[in-house]
Every structure is written in C-alpha cells, then in structure tokens.
Amino acid sequence: MNRKKRSDRNHIIYEIVNTINGKSYIGITAAIGRRFHYSAKLRLQKHFSRARRENKDWALYIDMRENDESVYDLFIVDVVRGKALAHQIEVELIKEFNYELNSTH
C-alpha cells in the first residue's frame, strides 16, 4: 500500500547573501524535524555542490562558481507549515524584493 504524502511538513524559507557583492537568493527547503538551521545549511551545501558539478546558467550557480563558499551568509526568513504555502510566500518575496540571484528575476 502506498503511503499518503504529508502535506503538513514544515518548510524553511531561507536567504543566501553574497557578502562581497550584496546579491541575494531566496529559496525553500523541507525541514528535517525541528532542525531548521541544519536543514537550510544542508540545502546551501547542495547548491554549492550542484554549482560545481552542473553547468547550469542559473544566476546563483554562476555567482557561486565565481566566489568562495566563505563569502555567503545564510539566513532563515521563515518556517511555515506546508509546501504550497512556502512556495506562495517565496514567490511573493521574489516579486516584492530584489533577489538578484533568483533565475526568475
């Protein structure tokens, strides 16, 4: 029997800021239990890994290939219940603020 996918899981809205050029990225990731900062840090590490391994022309990955990992700061913007709500807030934040490293910008 297939398990029903959970819709009530906590999701983290996070911001990555390049401290050299001031450019930033907003994203979401699923929380691992209540370890919010740890979950966001894992997602940041995955971004770094993909930026090195994949030849994506996404603004964030281009920026990461041009800079050392140490120039990036990670901030938790919010923790919300449910993926749909997290996506909705992410889209609203991207529209409202100048997140230069989001490829949708």
Named regions from a protein language model:
Residues M1-H105:
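Structure-specific nucleic-acid interaction/processing domains
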